[in-house]
A protein has these predicted regions:
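FAD-site-proximal beta/loop scaffold in flavoenzymes
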Residues: 144-158, 255-304
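Residues at the starts of beta-strands that form the adenosine-phosphate
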Residues: 5, 28, 163, 185-188, ...
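Short hydrophobic core segments
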Residues: 7-9, 120-133, 165-167, 245-254
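Rossmann-like dinucleotide-binding core of oxidoreductases
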Residues: 126-149, 158-219, 319-327
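Beta1/beta-strand and adjacent pyrophosphate-binding region of the FAD-binding site
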Residues: 2-14, 162-170
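Beta1-alpha1 glycine-rich phosphate/pyrophosphate-binding loop at the start
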Residues: 11-89, 174-203, 271-272
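A Rossmann-like FAD-binding core segment of flavoenzymes
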Residues: 88, 92-113, 120-123, 182-273
Length: 327
């Protein structure tokens, strides 16, 4: 069995930052991810532009460059690959962590790779940095599991000349609706609220509002989907029930951390907020020796922690681990 000082679950920016900080303190670390490096960013829309500036996405003291004021998805992917190479981080991609057994200083992490081969690793400490983008919020309506219903939006081309419903009114939904419209889809936006979210990026919000006002994108507000069929959707609006011809549905109503994995790992969650119990100084959980990093610290309040502030969790955790493990 391969042994490490620390096994890190999750190879997003926060997980990479943890690996860097541990390596700089002379600690061995293995990073395991069920997807690719920065898997969540890879699954962002192809043309996404970050809301923040490059220096706020940096980890390990490595500068991030961008051709524009704000970096895009492609630039971020390239940057994090470069950082992983520079620090020679030990990363296992496409490997699912199944269980974390044992206790502080003597953990056994069991996993399965994409070929179905099982692995075991010994670790003195464990860090969970699993993010929140893997589990989409569900509509809980009949037909949601049809192949035409998608919870992630990548790019618009496949939906040219199709009838597409976009559910939601935050950044993901607004961007998807606009790109789909620009590419020739017939777009309908459905949202339970009164209007487009005030948190939508300033260069997107007026654009989507103008398309709605002009009728170029059809909008149903204070409305919700009640049923999805192969060729239509049924929704309830303030004017009553409507049935729309439909080819594809993008249910972009948010995401949440993999709470089931946390509970299975023995992490205590607050019943009201689903926040894991952690030490605010060290980010160690109530399960001794297991630390939490990144957005999962916030429970259901995923708008509290982003790459910009979660990237500092690595130093916070690594400092405590190094002090406890000693020389």
């Amino acid at each position: 069995m391969n042994s490490f000082d620390v096994v890190i679950v999750g190879a997003g920016p926060t997980g990479l930052a943890c690996g860097i900080e541990l390596k700089q303190r002379g600690r061995s670390a293995l990073i395991i991810d069920k997807g690719c490096v920065v898997n969540s960013i890879y699954h962002y829309p192809t043309n996404l532009v970050f809301f923040t500036t490059p220096e706020l996405l940096e980890i390990g003291g490595i500068p991030m460059t961008s051709l524009n004021e704000k970096p895009n998805r492609h630039e971020a992917l390239k940057y994090y690959r470069r950082v992983a190479d520079y620090f020679k981080l030990n990363i296992h991609q496409y490997e699912q962590v199944d269980s974390i057994e044992g206790s502080d200083l003597n953990f056994t992490v069991r996993s399965t790779d994409r070929d179905g081969v099982h692995h075991e690793y010994s670790a003195r400490k464990v860090i969970l940095a699993t993010g929140y983008y893997d589990v989409p919020n569900r509509l809980n309506v009949p037909g949601e599991d049809l192949p035409k219903v998608l919870h992630y939006y990548k790019e618009p081309h496949p939906y040219y000349n199709q009838d597409v419903v976009v559910i939601g009114a935050k950044n993901s939904a607004a961007l998807a609706a606009l790109e789909l419209y620009w590419t020739g889809a017939r777009v309908t936006l459905v949202h339970r609220g009164e209007h487009i979210s005030s948190k939508v990026k300033y260069w997107i919000k007026p654009n989507i509002e103008n398309r709605l006002k002009a009728g170029e994108i059809t909008g149903y507000f204070r409305s919700h989907i009640t049923e999805i069929s192969p060729n239509s959707v049924r929704l309830v609006t303030p004017e009553g029930e409507k049935v729309l011809t439909n080819d594809f549905v993008f249910a972009l109503v948010g995401y949440r951390p993999d709470l089931e994995f946390l509970e299975r790992t023995g992490i205590s969650l607050d019943p009201a907020t689903l926040r894991p119990q952690t030490d605010k100084h060290t980010l160690e959980s109530a399960r001794n020796g297991v630390y939490l990093a990144g957005v999962i610290v916030a429970g259901m309040h995923t708008n509290e922690i982003f790459i910009e502030n979660g990237r500092f969790h690595g130093a916070q955790i690594a400092q405590d681990i190094a002090a406890r493990l000693g020389s």
